A protein has these predicted regions:
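The feature marks the mature, well-folded catalytic cores of soluble enzymes
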Residues: 1-230
Length: 230
């Protein structure tokens, strides 16, 4: 599905993930779905001629003396999925599609053990801090130290990085990062651990004070195990 970049604006990419090539029936015909949506005229879609999963594009925004600065965080799996293009070409395609010269691509290393290679379980945009810098919530504990360190360094160059603090880290604790946010509420996946589920909710309440009393948790462990949360 297209990924929402901001209110009323969606990015539409080529959805043809390598991990579904043996089960093509699960590859959504994005154009057909959009065509059947009666509300489609209310939104703007940007076509990007790149093979990218929506879960591998996390959008962030900051402020400086010249106005807004925009960021897209992706893992380097995008480079592998578009191997005929150079990194600079991929970056140019994305920047030109948005017509936003102040758009920065932040690349994270791709852990090959993660077949999805998505960033939406690694980093979550929280907002803009008092210094105008984007603030992000991250979960790096599931990665080997060298990969986690490289991810942290790449993110900290641009963002205020807040780490998800839990008493223990489950193989599914990345799901806490992959929450759903609307203008009215935030829904956080629960993974069936009463302690860490509560800790995740508490940290969201600290990071999103405007959403206090509107942050909810839905238990999804079995669903996430079966479907990766997608």
């Amino acid at each position: 599905m297209p990924v929402q970049a901001e209110e009323g604006l969606f990015v539409k990419f080529i959805y043809n993930p390598d991990y579904l090539q043996a089960e093509k029936r699960y590859i959504t015909n994005v154009d057909a779905v959009i065509a059947k949506n009666p509300f489609v005229r209310d939104y703007t879609f940007i076509d990007i001629p790149l093979v990218v999963d929506g879960g591998n594009m996390v959008f962030c925004k900051g402020l400086d003396n010249n106005g807004e600065v925009h960021y897209v965080v992706m893992t380097e799996k995008v480079l592998a999925e578009n191997a005929k293009l150079e990194r600079s070409q991929i970056e140019s395609i994305i920047v030109n599609a948005f017509q936003e010269p102040r758009l920065n691509i932040v690349w994270l290393p791709w852990d090959k053990e993660d077949v999805f290679g998505h960033t939406d379980g690694i980093v979550r945009y929280v907002g803009i801090n008092d210094e105008g810098k984007p603030k992000v919530l991250v979960n790096l504990e599931l990665y080997d130290d060298d990969i986690a360190d490289a991810m942290y360094m790449a993110l900290s160059r641009h963002f205020e990085v807040v780490e998800l603090h839990l008493d223990s880290y489950d193989e599914l604790s990345w799901a806490y990062i992959n929450s759903l946010q609307t203008k009215d509420f935030i829904i956080i996946p629960g993974i069936g651990d009463a302690i860490t589920d509560a800790q995740a909710v508490a940290q969201y309440n600290q990071l999103y004070p405007k959403y206090r009393d509107h942050i909810h948790q839905v238990q999804m462990r079995d669903f996430v195990l079966a479907n990766g949360g997608h």
